């Protein structure tokens, strides 16, 4: 019994029975540097700019409860490829919009409990190394709704 989720991971249909929700592990993607059409200004719509994407995901720990095969785990490889696919679809006006798309794709996997996402534009101001935002999202265990908290960073 296997089902497919859109992040490209194969998930056993009985996985929920095997997950210990009190235990988690982290998946980290640090400073994924990609070129993107992002921004509201004309020059940002005409030329790609470098962005940095960093993610920290708290995932239900199923490490000891199931067979150690990649298809049984949240795959950072699939997440990276899905982020690249989002950027290939075309121009995005705001980092906040890109952030929500990345959050949504990560939460498609029911094992992901929290997401901390940092998005930075690396070439906006010569006086800074970057400007950007951080987004934190947490699934509420009672009804699987997502609590939202958005903050900006320099």
Predicted regions mapped to residue ranges:
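N-terminal, polar/charged subdomain of small-to-medium soluble alpha/beta proteins
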Residues: 1-154
